[in-house]
Amino acid sequence: MTAPLSLFVTGTDTEIGKTFVSAAMLHGFARHGLRAAALKPVAAGAYQRDGVWRNEDADQLDAAANVVLPPELRTPFLLKAPAAPHIVAAQEGVTLDLDTIVACHREALTRADVVVVEGVGGFRVPLNDTQDTADLAVALGLPVVLVVGIRLGCISHALLTADAIRQRGLALAGWVANHVDPAMSFADENVATIRDWLAREHRAPLVGRIAHMTPAAPESAAAMLDIAALVESLRAARP
């Protein structure tokens, strides 16, 4: 039996389409014949429906997955206010515990062929007084896929984040160019520069380039991802 795959999705910033790309990957994995599940371990920003607290990002992931995990497993820490998680957690009296997330991930791996773990915000977002999302990725021991929001400043943001990933001893399994600014000048040149630098310095392949979409359509975006290349990279990144 083939061991399940898993990856940690991070971004160069917040609001650069991390959930959108994660959902697209879930659709892509399903088309690749894999049972695909999602974890959104920490979500900040909740709304109530039918007396149940929910999160829009988690809803999008559930809609894209062909294996839907129970909410308490998919998102063990659902915070109500849409703000920095360590601030909201302190206000709500919640301790964001990495061991709990690791246990949820371990259980998720028994239910799917591939588990997409979406982080919160960028690569180094504090979760408590001493740990951040980079520590979470390390605790999970997962290869990382970096979503780069293609807009002004994206080259520096991409290279800095890739360096931070390597400094934590993690493999950068690939990156996705997500065109968040349709009016950006020299978008092709920016993508080419990031592609060349990340390939040379990190051996990280470009596994997708997603055009600007209004409204966002993860199922359509899945066709813009090279899922076969991503699966190969994830397998190569296994310890």
Swiss-Prot record:
Biological process (GO), any one:
biotin biosynthetic process
The subcellular localization recorded is: Cytoplasm
Going by the record, the broad EC class of this enzyme is ligase
Active site (catalytic residues): 40
Which keywords, in A-to-Z order, does the entry hold?
Answer: ATP-binding, Biotin biosynthesis, Cytoplasm, Ligase, Magnesium, Metal-binding, Nucleotide-binding
GO cellular component entries: cytosol
Q: Which molecular function terms from Gene Ontology are attached? A: ATP binding; dethiobiotin synthase activity; magnesium ion binding
Q: Kindly give the NCBIfam families that the UniProt entry links to this protein.
A: bioD (TIGR00347)
Q: How does it assemble?
A: Homodimer.
* Name by which UniProt lists this protein: ATP-dependent dethiobiotin synthetase BioD
Q: What is the lineage of its organism?
A: Bacteria, Pseudomonadati, Pseudomonadota, Betaproteobacteria, Burkholderiales
